[in-house]
Amino acid sequence: DWVPPRLRFWLYMAFGFLYQYVGSINTSYSNQIVSEIALLNEDIQMAGYCTLGGITVCFPVMYRLKFYMYTRQLFFVSAIGIIICNALTMSVTEPWMIWGLAFIAGFYKMLGMFGCTSVFRLCVTPSRNYAVFFPVVYIMVCGGTYLSGITTAYLTYYGNWRLMNLFVIALMMIHCGIVYFMMKPDHRSGPFLSLKGVDFIGLFLWSAFLISGMWMFTYGEHYDWWTSSTIW
């Protein structure tokens, strides 16, 4: 209650920009990571697609997760999950582990971003005019992604690709600190909704289907499509 309403809006906007920096792996530094860990370019592309896959499968369940947890809990879960994924990515060398971490990081990225945008929606447009709201979200997504690319370019130029992961971890830790000290522990944006009835098996199967399709189209040319036993 002691946080001024105007400051609350800008804090949520800042949180949205922060979530655009996240992802356990960034395709902008693919050259460095391919050279250091001896991976294929397709391995890094696949990790980028897995991040998008994680964002996609979050959509059907993010409303239930939002109303299942308090707002502060949602931000903690998203930020801590991203921190763990980024920390593990710096040490693993197996492509399938990198893909899994990228997929999970994408899921948490979308969950945290949704937590930000759904909270300040009425601040942007009290009349719920989505013609006003979506351009603001578009600015956040595109602006955050653009700034992420610039930051990655400078950090990898003066250091190596792990600096970007450390930078993301630092941002998420600052985010957790602000959330801990400036948000109510028991605030929820709507009525409580349990996770009973959520088809988690279907979520897993759709995730496997998406990852399989992305793998086939990413590695198809490398393995010579249908003439390869690996594709079959």
Per-segment meaning from a language model:
Residues 1-24, 28, 35:
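Cytosolic juxtamembrane N-terminal segment immediately preceding the first transmembrane helix
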Residues 48-64, 110-117:
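Central cavity-lining transmembrane alpha-helices of secondary-active solute carriers
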Residues 57-96:
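Conserved MFS/SLC helix-loop-helix module at the cytosolic interface between two early adjacent transmembrane helices
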Residues 105-137:
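Cytoplasmic helix-loop-helix junction between adjacent transmembrane helices
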Residues 35, 85-90, 105, 179:
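MFS-fold secondary transporters
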Residues 38, 70, 88-97, 108, ...:
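Helix-breaking motifs and short loop linkers at transmembrane-helix boundaries and internal kinks
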Residues 29-58:
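Extracellular/periplasmic helix-loop-helix junction of adjacent transmembrane segments
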Residues 159-232:
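Hydrophobic transmembrane-helix bundles of small-molecule transporters
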